[in-house]
From Swiss-Prot:
Entry protein name: TPR repeat-containing protein P27G11.02
Localization annotation: Mitochondrion
Domain of life: Eukaryota
Gene3D superfamilies: Tetratricopeptide repeat domain
One GO BP annotation of this record: mitochondrial protein catabolic process
PROSITE patterns: TPR, TPR_REGION
Keywords, comma-separated and alphabetical: Mitochondrion, Repeat, TPR repeat, Transit peptide
Lineage per the UniProt record: Eukaryota, Fungi, Dikarya, Ascomycota, Taphrinomycotina
UniProt xrefs under SUPFAM superfamilies: TPR-like
GO molecular function term, any single one: misfolded protein binding
Length: 356
């Protein structure tokens, strides 16, 4: 009898199993239990996220924090009213911090002033931003916990020095960066350190001290070796250019050595360009190789080998097809015109000279 009942009930049992198995073929969100668990997890994460106070609320009294939240919100705007409102909110935050008896030389308060300087820079008030960055740098000189921010402020000063024409004044900022990097006090990654070394080296070069730039470009290049890129070609040529520039400031007996070193680095940049797969050569690769060919042309010209100089200049100019507006190709084009004119004038002088 029992077997007969099971046989008669087989259809209903099959339906039960089919319904259960069909649950596992439904999309995840249509399964009752997993969807419920996922919803609870999302709500839990959201609750933890929104319950956790922001760094502003942790580091500032509530009366100061409210102005900072407003300032940061306004700072995201794009019109003048947003900048003005953000500036007023920062000023109110500073006044409120003073009334709350906060130490006005402490990192939190200097952090507010740093945001104000950033706002000035983004609004185009470069001279005011420059002055404020310097003031913060001087006020924080004895704050050990503010070193990384000081390095980044110094980097910002170097960035502003070029449009303001104040490269020589910014060398103190570069000194600070180099000291922090060489003493291993700055904890950025290799890419960030390389960028800071390069930025400082470029400033020293622009300020007329290429001998300071050479070791810094070398440090910047070494930090890129673990992950080679086309930017390495730019650094190699910067090294070559700095070595060549030293011939203008040192005794003539050192000129040949400096030119050989410069030639070696320029040739390394060219070799690296042709070693890379064509598909991997980006705009930086083309610009770096063009600049390296131009430097090789300069060296050959100074050595009196005009034919070789023209060859290098033409190789540089040929890279305009890949990057039409790179500096090396354009300078090479000017150099070719100059050498062609010189050759033409010499030819005229020869033909017009009296013969016996």
């Amino acid at each position: 009898m029992r077997m007969q009942w099971i046989w008669k009930s087989r259809r209903s049992l099959q339906n039960v199993f089919i319904r259960r198995s069909s649950q596992y073929h439904k999309p995840f969100w249509r399964r009752p239990l997993p969807a419920t668990l996922l919803g609870c997890a999302v709500l839990g994460v959201a609750a933890v996220y929104f319950a956790k106070p922001s760094p502003i609320d942790e580091n500032y009294p509530r009366s100061v924090a409210k102005y900072l939240h407003e300032a940061l919100y306004r700072q995201k705007g794009e019109n003048n009213h947003d900048f003005q409102d953000a500036w007023k909110a920062y000023q109110s935050a500073i006044k409120q911090a003073e009334s709350e008896k906060m130490d006005m030389e402490s990192p939190p308060v200097q952090g507010i002033r740093l945001q104000m300087a950033n706002l000035l820079a983004s609004a185009g008030a470069l001279h005011k931003a420059w002055s404020m960055y310097w003031d913060i740098l001087e006020r924080t000189s004895k704050l050990p916990d503010f070193l990384e921010q000081r390095v980044l402020i110094a980097s910002k000063l170097i960035e502003l020095s070029e449009p303001l024409g104040l490269q020589k004044d910014a060398t103190k900022a570069a000194d600070l960066i180099v000291k922090a990097l060489l003493s291993k006090q700055f904890n950025g990654d290799d890419e960030q350190k390389s960028r800071l070394f390069e930025q400082s080296a470029t400033l020293y070069f622009q300020a007329g001290t290429p001998s300071y730039a050479v070791p810094l470009y070398h440090e910047a290049l070494n930090l890129t070796m673990a992950n080679p890129s086309c930017h390495g070609l730019i650094l190699m040529n910067n090294l070559a250019t700095s070595l060549l520039a030293q011939t203008e400031t040192v005794d003539k007996k050192h000129h040949e050595t400096l030119m050989k070193q410069s030639q070696s680095w320029s040739q390394k940049a060219v070799d690296s360009y042709y070693f890379a797969y064509p598909k991997d050569r980006n705009q930086e690769c083309h610009a770096g190789c063009a600049a390296a060919f131009y430097t090789l042309g300069q060296i050959a010209e100074r050595q009196g080998n005009i034919d070789l100089a023209l060859k290098h200049y033409k190789n540089s100019e040929a890279l305009r097809k890949d990057d039409p507006y790179n500096d090396g190709s354009m300078l090479s084009h000017i150099a070719i015109d100059r050498l062609d004119k010189d050759a033409f004038i010499k030819k005229l002088d020869k033909s017009s000279s009296p013969t016996d």
